[in-house]
Amino acid sequence: MYESYINKIEDVGKLRNLKPGTIRTYQNNIKDFLKFINKHPNELTCEDARDFLLYLKNKVNKASTLNNKNGALVFFYKRVLGKLWDDNLVPRAINDYAIPRVLSRSEVERLLDATPNLKYKAMFALMYSAGLRISEVIHLNYDDISRTNMQI
């Protein structure tokens, strides 16, 4: 229905060097928003965006999902429509941070004992003892380790 606006999201996104996945996400989020609000984009207000996010919140969406939609709306309003955005009227949701579950010493020992490959055993031990993520261990270089201080 408003395909020219959806196409403009792609054009502006490319100019701003957004990744193709981000552009597609923005387009899909704005399509959902326009279907929900059922107004011409030139008539949109921040209250419309707020109503949409409240609707999604009432459908028990997570804060990260709401913030994803909010980001698409901000981009659409400011960059595509050239409208002002009121962060006070349409605030970002506060993330629900989950406390990570930490393995017990016996669970770590069982993991290491169950890993026959010495390389992976060393990686798991390093991840656990230094609190590193998988990507941090994978990208670790020889020069990242201070052998005199025994520190990473």
Predicted feature descriptions by range:
Residues M1-I152:
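Conserved catalytic core of the tyrosine transesterase superfamily
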